[in-house]
Amino acid sequence: MEDFYQHIYQKQQAVQDMPSNKAIAQWAVGLMHLLFPERNSKTFHTVQEIEDAFKQSEADLYLMLFKTKACSSCNIKKISEQFFTNLPSIYERMLTDAKAIMDGDPAAQSLNEVIRTYPGFLAISIYRLANELWTQGIPLIPRILTEYAHSKTGIDIHPGALLMSTFISIMVLVL
């Protein structure tokens, strides 16, 4: 038994420090709630509150990257800032995805319904966040995000995949 304990101890010493998968997923879910209030019961009362919430999410991303040993050589300040600079265009792609799902599914009653309830929208949206981090060279975190979406939706999209709008339409037909 002593060899077994020693083996487990050595494995634990070799584990790379990083936030838990749950904390990483919670960051993405929180960001989704900011982007799409349809997915959340919390609303903000001023533009300043929204701006502060996005700044907090950026700080949370920075801290998450800082706590990730595999990111020790990354320029985490630049990556965090670039992610949030690119967020408006990521958001626009997410809206385009939601519209494509709605247009491709005759059962969809509204954009609100697609955003709030469709697993395909959640999977693609989390992928969009993960892909931005993947593109910036962040290790492991993008895959954790897409695996979170996979666990919630059954839809597995690699964070490095390149999705075109035709993919969204085809996916709607398959789902």
Predicted regions and their residues:
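Terminal amphipathic alpha-helical/low-complexity segments used for targeting or macromolecular assembly
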Residues: 1-147
